[in-house]
Amino acid sequence: MRSRLLLSVAHLPTIRETTEEMLLGGPGQEPPPSPSLDDYVRSISRLAQPTSVLDKATAQGQPRPPHRPAQACRKGRPAVSLRDITARFSGQQPTLPMADTVDPLDWLFGESQEKQPSQRDLPRRTGPSAGLWGPHRQMDSSKPMGAPRGRLCEARMPGHSLARPPQDGQQSSDLRSWTFGQSAQAMASRHRPRPSSVLRTLYSHLPVIHEL
C-alpha cells in the first residue's frame, strides 16, 4: 500500500548541471559565463540581510501620519484620580478638589490623621466603670479633710496574731488569757525534745548485732 501511494505522487524534478546549461544556453549555443566573485558576494549579502531591514526601508518610503503631541493625547483622556476610584468603590461622591492639585499620598495620610482622635481628647478611663469614678471623686473632694479616724495601728509581731486591744471591763481578763497562752507556748517550746536527744534514746533501745 505504501509503495502504491508513493507512485501516485509526482516526483520532484532533479537539477543536473548538464541539463541546466542546456536549458539556459539552448541547443547549439555557448554556455553563459560563470558569475564573478563580486556577483557571488552580492548574492550572499542579499541573502544574509534580514527581512526587518527591508521592511523598514520600504516603510521609510511611505508618507508618515502627522505627529500628535503627547499632551494632546493626555488631554483627550478623562483624568481619573485616586479619590474618584476610592469613592466609586465605597459608594460615596467625591467632595474634595481634584487630585491634579493635591498629592494622593498627602490626601490619604491627612484623612487617616483626621479620623484618628488625639490622645488628649480620649478619657483616661473607658468602659462602664469610667462613669462610676466621676461621682466618687466629686464626693471625696467635697468631703472636708478632718482628723484621722480613731483606730490604733495594729502591728504584726513574729509569733503573734493581730488582735484589737481589750476594751473597758474585759481588759484584765483578756490580758490574763493572752499572757497565759504566751507562757504556755514558751513552756511547750522549752520542754520539746531536740532531735539529737530523740536519736540517742532510739539508739540506746535498739539491739546490738555483733558480727562473727
From Swiss-Prot:
Annotated compartments: Cytoplasm; Peroxisome; Mitochondrion
Mitochondrion keyword on record: yes
One of the protein's GO biological processes: autophagy
Main location: cytoplasm
Induction or repression: By progesterone, testosterone and, to a much lower extent, estrogen. Induced by oxidative stress via FOXO3 activation. Up-regulated by hypoxia (at protein level).
Keyword Metal-binding: no
Expression (tissue specificity): Expressed in various tissues, including pancreas, placenta, ovary, testis and kidney.
Keywords: Autophagy, Cytoplasm, Mitochondrion, Peroxisome
Region of interest: Disordered: 20-39, 49-79, 113-176
Pfam families per record: DEPP
Free-text function comment from the UniProt entry: Acts as a critical modulator of FOXO3-induced autophagy via increased cellular ROS.
Protein name: Protein DEPP1
Gene source species: Homo sapiens (Human)
Organism ancestry: Eukaryota, Metazoa, Chordata, Craniata, Vertebrata
